Amino acid sequence: MIRNVLLAFMICSGMTLLGGCSSVMSHTGGKEGTYPGTRASATMIGDDETNWGTKSLAILDMPFTAVMDTLLLPWDVFRKDSSVRSRVEKSEANAQATNAVIPPARMPDN
């Protein structure tokens, strides 16, 4: 009896920990829109360059990713884009705007 309960607990824990991998990976970056993990899994499944092992894992993970993306939908709607890439792009745009206003220095005549 205890062995069956322990086995069921281990299986459920493993499914919970492994489920929604695409969703978790997609949410670690910048703003990807809504349902980023599900879109990533669908793209991976439809890609001809993806091997059969990865496709089978993506197919197995797809329902869990869809559930995780649904649970994280409010976060996707209200979060701000604070990825490293977006911060660097914003900083470079500010630097370009500053440099456009400041005229270049004159070179001394020899």
Swiss-Prot record:
Keywords: Signal. Pfam families: DUF1375. Residues 1-26 form the signal peptide. The keyword DNA repair does not apply. GO terms for cellular component: cell outer membrane. InterPro entries: DUF1375. GO terms for biological process: DNA damage response. It comes from the Bacteria. Residues 87-110 are annotated as: Disordered. To E.coli YceK. This is Uncharacterized protein YidQ.
